[in-house]
A protein has these predicted regions:
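"…centered on the first transmembrane helix and the immediately adjacent amphipathic helix/loop
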Residues: 1-57, 70, 74
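Short, charged juxtamembrane terminal tails flanking transmembrane helices
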Residues: 2, 118-120
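Membrane-interfacial alpha-helical segments at the cytosolic side of multi-pass membrane proteins
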Residues: 47-61, 92, 106-117
């Protein structure tokens, strides 16, 4: 991947991190309402699956070497996101199971990217 393309992936990744933190800053009233058709753990899994894919696009290593550091980055960011929610208040609190779903989502996203994306 050339330098310009890698830079674009890094900008996209950092922007997505900002979106995650922004949504985490919203009060429950600011979040989409309606009946919960899907478990919030599934939403966390998907959210951090995309995080893992974007992280791989931005920082992935050559094919054949599994980037465990990106999985750890996703797990760490998920934990920090939960701490952020707890710290800002707004009727939101940290949930260890949300952080676990974030870590698993990150692992799945990085794995999917590693398996299906050709990077030189």
């Amino acid at each position: 991947m050339n330098g310009i393309m890698s830079f674009k992936w890094k900008i996209l990744f950092l922007g997505y991190c900002g979106v995650i933190l922004y949504v985490s800053s919203l009060s429950p009233k600011g979040l989409p309402g309606g009946p919960a058709l899907v478990s919030d753990k599934i939403l966390h899994l998907c959210e951090y699956g995309l995080f893992g894919i974007l992280a791989w696009g931005a920082f992935g290593v050559r094919k054949g070497v599994f980037p465990w550091g990106l999985v750890v980055l996703g797990a760490w960011f998920g934990i920090m996101d939960e701490c952020w929610q707890d710290w800002i208040g707004k009727s939101r609190s940290a949930d260890v199971w949300d952080a676990a779903a974030d870590a698993v989502g990150s692992l799945l996203g990085v794995t999917v990217a590693q398996l299906f994306w050709i990077k030189r």
